[in-house]
UniProtKB/Swiss-Prot annotation:
The lineage of its organism: Bacteria, Pseudomonadati, Bacteroidota, Cytophagia, Cytophagales. It comes from Cytophaga hutchinsonii (strain ATCC 33406 / DSM 1761 / CIP 103989 / NBRC 15051 / NCIMB 9469 / D465). It comes from the Bacteria. Keywords: Ribonucleoprotein, Ribosomal protein, RNA-binding, rRNA-binding. The gene is rplN. GO terms for biological process: translation. Transmembrane segments: none annotated. This is Large ribosomal subunit protein uL14. Part of the 50S ribosomal subunit. Forms a cluster with proteins L3 and L19. In the 70S ribosome, L14 and L19 interact and together make contacts with the 16S rRNA in bridges B5 and B8. Gene3D superfamilies: Ribosomal protein L14.
């Protein structure tokens, strides 16, 4: 369960290392984000040689959460960290590589580019 002020690690090579959630997108009173939800984030730490500087505001999609997600077949999936992938204005990933596994739920939410770049889809 990702909410405002949650810190997420970044699972791509956009240059940011850690981000802070400013807002959960998707409705007036939406409080929590899960896998596949879009959030507005600000960069808290970044690689010095990248164009993503500290304080940059961007959109991101949540790709891993510690909170388990129930699937239609009754099984659950959870990850060891909370992670996001940064998006550009066209909702495409800013980076060209994705690190670590991502959930299959991203395919249902039409983030096919992230699914195709990921090394493993669970």
């Amino acid at each position: 369960m990702i909410q405002q002020e949650s810190r997420l690690s970044v699972a791509d090579n956009s240059g940011a290392k850690e981000v802070l959630v400013i807002r959960v997108l998707g409705g007036t009173g939406k409080r929590y984000a899960s896998i596949g939800d879009k959030v507005v984030v600000t960069v808290k730490s970044a690689i010095s040689s990248s164009n993503m500087k500290k304080g940059t505001v961007s959109k991101a999609v949540v790709v891993r959460t510690k909170k388990e997600v129930k699937r239609a077949d009754g099984s659950y999936i959870r990850f060891s960290d909370n992670a996001a992938v940064l998006l550009n204005n066209n909702d495409e990933p800013r980076g060209t590589r994705i690190f670590g596994p991502v959930a299959r739920e991203l395919r249902d939410k039409q983030f096919m580019k992230i699914v195709s770049l990921a090394p493993e889809v669970l």
